[in-house]
Amino acid sequence: MMETALLRYCVNFSGHKKISAHQRSNSEIPKTSPGGCEDEWCARVLSRRSVMASGLVSSTTALAFPREGLAVVKQGLLAGRVPGLSEPDEEGWRTYRRPDEKSGGHGVGWSPIIPYAFSVPQDWNEVPVSIADLGGTEIDLRFASPKEGRLSVIVAPVLRFADNLGDDVKIENIGQPAKVINAFGPEVIGENVEGKVLSSNVAEHDGRLYYQFELEPPHVLITATAAGNRLYLFSVTGNGLQWKRHYKDLKRIASSFRIV
């Protein structure tokens, strides 16, 4: 509208005597008294007005459609190689390692989160984490595949559950597998897990224990361990069809979780 009005002004005064240079300033439109609109000056002003109008339209669009704007920003950040995610190996699997510089710490006084790693098929990608999600700010990461399922990593301070475990906690210090899943399973599925555990297993890698659980439908695999002053809950899930078709891959993903 601003640009159209200015263009109409310039057209209306074309053909009149040119205004002298000392009668106008850079920020002033010529008066309607004898004089006119120089083509070069009009073009320069219109160009400046176009830039201002374009900026105004862009700002208004971002305010009116914040979700779309944020989605574009997020898409730009995630385009190409995701930070922490390796190139596919010969089987088409990639390894994600939490970047050392990634933010997160759950409050003043907490040490940096000790990095973790896991492997996923090539079509799995990181998705945004919302504070409105189950688990709130303790969800450190989400990945998903439209075909196979989704996963999340919850990193919870153990001080929430016990205050005498120190700053270098092992999962066995918290308790046996049954105690851990009953206490922390609700952090993952949002409800009591009593009677829902189909199987449990204890694995050891590089001297660290990992408790592995499979829960009944809605299907979920949970790997739990502890490091520093935090408990790590790695969950992998899918709908009924995904579970049936891709159980082997989902199981492999869940078993790949490591503290590094």
UniProtKB/Swiss-Prot annotation:
One protein family per Pfam: PsbP
Principal location class: plastid
Source organism superkingdom: Eukaryota
Keyword field: Chloroplast, Plastid, Thylakoid, Transit peptide
Keyword Cytoplasm assigned: no
UniProt-recorded Gene Ontology molecular function terms: calcium ion binding
Annotated compartments: Plastid, Chloroplast thylakoid lumen
GO biological process: photosynthesis
GO CC aspect terms: chloroplast; chloroplast stroma; chloroplast thylakoid; chloroplast thylakoid lumen; cytosol; extrinsic component of membrane; mitochondrion; photosystem II oxygen evolving complex
Similarity section: Belongs to the PsbP family.
Protein name, UniProt field: PsbP domain-containing protein 4, chloroplastic
Lineage: Eukaryota, Viridiplantae, Streptophyta, Embryophyta, Tracheophyta
Gene responsible for this protein: PPD4
